[in-house]
Amino acid sequence: MGDIENLGGEYPEKLKDVPEDERADWLTEEYVKGSYAYGEEEVANEQARQAIIELNKRIYKIHEDNDHDSPFAQIYWTCRQWSYDYFDKFYAQIGTKFEKYYPESETAPLGLTTVREHIGSVYQESDGAIVFDGEKYGLHTRVFINSNGLPTYEAKDVGLIMKKWQDYNFDLSVVITGNDIIEYMKVVLKSIEQFMPELAARSRHLTHGIVKLAGGTKMSSRTGNILRAIDVLEAANEANKKLNEQENPETVLGAVKYAFLKNRMGGDIIYDPVESVSLEGNSGPYIQYAHARARSILAKASSGSQASQTGLEPDERSLARKIGEYPEVVDKAVAELMPHHICTYLYELAQNFNRFYEHNRVIDNERQNIRLQLIQHYANTLKNGLNLLSIAAPERLWA
């Protein structure tokens, strides 16, 4: 959108020249150009900056007028739909979905209105802009409406939080962003606290670090050095084919999810595609294999062929004790909103089971029944934990 001249002017039919499978890349390239030209990088171009501001104003006007027919509007709506289509496809691929999207066209007007309603009591005028004086609360002062009368990201986030409250009347809203806007979000929530303290109290901000590939390459969405989520999946798939000589999308997806979730939220993530798909160490496939191994034992056993036993031997007791820790671990993960606790537990549980199985015969053993019951509880617990992480627990690791 920031480079309409490259389309030959405002001619929406020119968009047909962009192949369907290249739309996401094209949009990304245009985003990077616009971001760079606006001055988020050091080389700011004032003429381009003003042109982008005017484009932004025109986009707001499109929504105000419900314009779907003008050439500019057709370009805008088409590109926005391309973005939605891409993300819908990707979310389906990773097994998730969003119930509702909140585009800026919905959040910005509400944020603008809300901020204006509280000028004087919460927000103040300053050099033609509207700001929140965060310094009174040990924070910093930020602009919520700029001198052009447009809402900044701060006002849009006020609108987003307000809109979600109107739609869901939630008990808890968790906002997840990068670590670089911790102070920014403190200001936004502190401003809301002044006129809706209950809403601010029900909004929680969690942050994460940056993602780098092993070797130090940073994943970024605002510069030309871009590595998309789909690229991470493709890297894991290639590593899996080389390391395990198998193609299994379910296992690869679980490997990537686990590689991210096992890290405590808040820190940076060093992602190693080969390590993530390995059947050894703290990886998704290791845990999936430990589950498949247990299911294989249960499938081969003829339940009831051995006499019942009472009491537990030391190795059995150790595994049973670890299984029993599961509810407490889940409670802790939920209370802290930290899924890495579940990952750590599942890894330790799988290790415990593997040690147990290596040293204790199960089939055709006088303690077969009690050990099969123990393995059944273990497999169910492992599966439940993986399900909480949205990771599949296959009966067999390789198809």
Residue ranges and their predicted role:
Residues 1-399:
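Non-catalytic interaction-recognition regions
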